[in-house]
Regions:
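N-terminal cap/recognition module
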Residues: 1-5
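Acidic carboxylate diad motif detector
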Residues: 6-116
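Positively charged, helix-rich recognition surfaces that bind polyanionic ligands
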Residues: 101-104, 116-337
Length: 337
């Protein structure tokens, strides 16, 4: 059964025979269709062995999202302080001036309303004119991503690991305490003690807000790092195709690897490069950037992960990550993202 046939069955057979499910019709019709399409895509990817079995989404347990699309000129109208959403009507925006308004001639094609940690967000697809001109005349750079430092650039700039900062460590300790408190409330509730359900929901919201705050700090750091790199206007940027899935199998490194958000960095860097007319090169994951001497091109096969300084028989001595960044910059075998 395809997503289209499921939608026909839902409207013509299931809802008429189940009056208690009539609330589905109260929702914006395109939002229901989009949910069915997403479910169809998820199952298709599962049967093609491209992803795991789809997770069941439920209000209160998952991040709820609502999709809307512009069917006529009166839909999806945006002003500086408010946005008109089909079915919901006018909704005030807390952060004013971020979305291009209809008065300025911009057209909103579609959007998504989502909720995270008791906060509502809207993201919109807007058609904008492409007026930017590429002026990337500087030398290309290579970026080596790692765990000790988040990113080492071949121009000498190093971006520290934000997860080692005192602020994030404090928040992670606070998160552990709140998670333990939530677990105790669930245990007491199962034993039939006097812990109220409302208190569990309050504690759950505390945990969600801490998760969201930590995630926002990491995402903000990635955005600022990419913006600073792109401002140097290199002619090209070379990164390595990291085997993150393989790195996650190491139980000693999995948490540190996940918190670095390497894939998000790559996706956002690719979008920024496309926006500014830069070429993003991706070196093969088997390219020995860390083990190759930048001076004589000799490969040290005995180099260990604990060796932070690269020493070659030719006398070349350099920081391991900086040496890898230089090799990535000069890599001749790559794919353009």
């Amino acid at each position: 059964m395809t997503g289209k046939s499921f939608s026909v069955w839902l409207n013509n057979e299931y809802i008429p025979n189940n009056p208690d499910k009539a609330w589905i019709k109260e929702v914006y019709s395109k939002a229901v269709k989009r949910s069915i399409e997403d479910g169809c895509t998820a199952f298709t990817r599962f049967f093609k062995h491209q992803s795991d079995f789809p997770k069941f989404k439920k209000k209160g347990k998952s991040d709820v999202k609502m999709y809307f699309v512009r069917n006529n000129p009166k839909d999806c109208v945006c002003e500086r302080h408010r946005l008109k959403i089909p079915t919901l009507g006018w909704v005030r925006i807390k952060e004013k001036g971020y979305i291009p308004t209809t008065k300025d001639g911009y057209v909103i094609k579609s959007g998504t309303v989502s909720i995270k940690a008791d906060r509502y967000y809207v993201s919109v697809l807007v058609e904008l004119p492409d007026n930017k001109t590429a002026d990337n005349s500087n030398e290309g750079i290579g970026i080596d991503l790692g765990l000790k430092d988040f990113a080492t650039v071949s121009n000498g700039k190093t971006y520290k690991n934000i997860n080692k900062s005192a602020k994030l460590k404090k928040l992670e300790k606070q998160l552990i305490r709140e998670q333990r408190s939530l677990s105790r409330k669930y245990e007491n509730s199962q034993k039939g003690e006097s812990t109220q359900r409302a208190n569990i929901q309050k504690q759950k919201l505390k945990v969600q807000k801490l998760h969201h705050r930590i995630d926002n700090i990491r995402t903000d750091y990635i955005n600022k790092t990419i913006a600073e790199i792109v401002k140097t206007k290199p002619s090209y940027i070379t990164i390595e195709d990291l085997n993150v899935k393989g790195m996650m199998k190491n139980r000693h490194l999995s948490k540190a690897v996940a918190s670095q958000k390497f894939y998000e960095f790559r996706i956002k860097l690719q979008a920024k490069c496309n926006e500014n007319g830069m070429e993003l090169r991706v070196a093969n994951r088997w390219y020995p950037s860390s083990k190759t001497c930048h001076c004589c091109k000799n490969i040290r096969k005995d180099l260990k992960l604990s060796d932070r300084i690269f020493k070659c028989a030719c006398g070349y001595i350099e920081d391991r990550d900086f040496n890898a960044a230089l090799n990535l910059r000069d890599a001749m075998t790559y794919e353009v993202a």
